[in-house]
């Protein structure tokens, strides 16, 4: 039985305690976020498609962990079988470390190793991942002609059936992984000793809790930190926060002695103490729409960014408008378009003055949204939204904002609140509409999971109905927020 795997090795590089907890106390992990679930699904889909770059291979994936020893042996048998040209998820084990290599291709008397990533850029984690796999392969005596990372080509434009040879790019990392072999060997021995400890290693909370990824044991490791601690401030980076923490600054009162009294940092700590929000009203009001608009609409876009382009003329992760809701402040008519037969009761989704459109049933219709938005937005002077994306850029990209009939100004509450240093203890490290609703109105009606799933994969049928409801609810929250600060 193996001790380390690719995922546990990477986790151990980030934090020894997190590695120990995952191996010995996995039940203490935080609940897997919906974002992570969607990301895993996307990675799996891209990995399967990548097999077509080297077709005709044998899938070595085990059905359960109990099959690992069997699959290791089968992999070895295939290495010596000249009839086997390609293997997917080939299983190797060396020095108590197990890997499953995405693609292994016979290359004369040697083998080409390929690890697939669903991103358009390669990160340090991906290189560390490859270095571990090379360490195991080399330790097993597998002769390699090259080791490559395969990732999505951001310049690829779909023109007919997906051309996998053009969709993916490959980068040789052979030189890098050879240079890192000694480093990997040292870490493997160190991390095996960590796992063998009779108790978890004494590792304090620190910058590693969120770098390079948010740790899924924060709920356990941070349980003794007060919920209103200055460590949850966003006005200071983690380096500064933990530098003070390790120097004995353990309370908000002590932290206030280290910073300027009227600074953003101080105001955030006061908000933590009183469980209230802080905003710089001087900045906020300087950003207010001028002159006061006579007609206002609240726009909510649900964008879909498929890793593998679905429609002609699109690129990997290129956004398309999957749905939108438009709420006019003084409209009294309601209309809903595109009702698929699989969604009974859809007409009940109409809210007073709200227009909802989607193409869940047929993504090829997504450009209809552009014509609809050009026509409907032309009736307003101000279009208000709440999105981390730059909505003006999105509208420009799709020629919505350049249309001559459009004379409105886009007002993104997300950007405005951030510029005005809005902060609330419930928001902490991420401003979302759901958290904003809790902070300002002490209410939680919004279910954001459907939005996240649809933006990542757009194949969760159960989320469609919820997403339509959320589009309307989100606009209501945006309207309440705008009216709170600017009316």
Question: Where is each model-derived feature located?
Answer:
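Acidic, Mg2+-coordinating catalytic module of metal-dependent nucleases/exonucleases
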Residues: 162-227, 441-487
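Long, highly charged low-complexity segments
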Residues: 252-308
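Conserved RNase H-like, two-metal-ion catalytic cores of nucleic-acid enzymes
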Residues: 92, 284-376
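Helix-loop elements that line ligand-binding/catalytic pockets
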Residues: 203-212, 216-253, 278, 352, ...
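Flexible loop/turn segments at secondary-structure boundaries
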Residues: 28, 121, 156-157, 252, ...
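Conserved DEDDh/DEDDy metal-dependent 3′-5′ exonuclease domain
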Residues: 84-90, 94, 98-102, 113-116, ...
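Metal-dependent nuclease catalytic cores that hydrolyze phosphodiester bonds in DNA/RNA
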Residues: 1-109, 239-272, 459-460, 473
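Short acidic-glycine loop/turn motifs at beta-strand connectors
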Residues: 106-110, 328-331
């Amino acid at each position: 039985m193996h001790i380390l795997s690719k995922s546990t090795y990477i986790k151990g590089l980030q934090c020894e305690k997190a590695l120990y907890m995952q191996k010995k106390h996995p039940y203490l992990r935080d609940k897997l976020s919906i974002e992570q679930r969607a990301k895993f699904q996307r990675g799996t889909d891209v990995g399967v498609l990548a097999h077509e770059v080297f077709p005709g291979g044998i899938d070595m994936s085990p059905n359960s962990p109990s099959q690992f020893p069997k699959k290791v042996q089968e992999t070895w048998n295939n290495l010596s079988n000249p009839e086997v040209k390609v293997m997917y998820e080939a299983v190797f084990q060396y020095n108590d470390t197990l890997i499953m290599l995405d693609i292994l291709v016979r290359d004369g008397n040697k083998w080409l190793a390929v690890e697939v990533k669903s991103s358009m850029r390669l990160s340090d984690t991906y290189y560390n991942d490859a270095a571990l796999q090379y360490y195991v392969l080399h330790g097993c005596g597998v002769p390699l002609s090259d080791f490559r990372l395969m990732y999505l080509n951001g310049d690829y434009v779909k023109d007919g059936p997906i051309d996998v040879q053009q969709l993916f790019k490959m980068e040789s990392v052979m030189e890098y992984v050879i240079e890192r072999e000694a480093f990997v060997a040292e870490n493997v021995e160190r991390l095996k000793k960590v796992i063998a400890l009779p108790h978890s290693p004494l590792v304090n909370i620190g910058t590693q809790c969120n770098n390079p990824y948010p740790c899924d044991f924060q709920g356990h490791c941070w349980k003794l930190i007060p919920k209103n601690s200055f460590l949850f401030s966003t006005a200071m980076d983690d380096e500064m926060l933990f530098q003070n923490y390790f120097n004995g600054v353990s309370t908000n009162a002590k932290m206030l002695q280290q910073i300027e009294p009227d600074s953003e940092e101080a105001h955030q700590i006061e908000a933590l103490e009183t469980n209230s929000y802080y905003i710089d009203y001087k900045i906020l009001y300087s950003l207010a729409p001028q002159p006061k608009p006579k007609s206002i609409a609240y726009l909510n876009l649900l964008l879909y960014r498929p890793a593998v382009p679905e429609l002609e003329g699109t690129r990997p992760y290129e956004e398309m408008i999957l749905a939108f809701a438009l709420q006019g402040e003084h409209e009294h008519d309601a209309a809903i378009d595109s009702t698929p037969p699989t969604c009974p009761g859809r007409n009940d989704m109409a809210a007073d003055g709200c227009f909802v459109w989607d193409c869940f049933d047929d993504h090829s219709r997504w450009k209809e949204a552009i014509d609809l938005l050009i026509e409907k937005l032309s009736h307003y002077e101000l279009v208000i939204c709440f999105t981390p994306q730059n909505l003006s850029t999105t509208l420009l990209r799709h020629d919505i904002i350049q249309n001559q009939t459009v004379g409105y100004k886009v007002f993104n509450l997300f950007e405005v609140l951030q510029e005005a240093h809005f902060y609330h203890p419930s928001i902490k490290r991420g401003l979302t509409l759901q958290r904003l609703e809790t902070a300002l109105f002490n209410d939680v009606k919004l279910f954001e999971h459907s939005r996240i799933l649809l933006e990542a994969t757009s194949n969760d049928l159960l989320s469609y109905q919820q997403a339509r409801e959320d589009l309307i609810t989100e606009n209501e929250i945006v309207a309440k927020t705008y009216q709170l600060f600017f009316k």
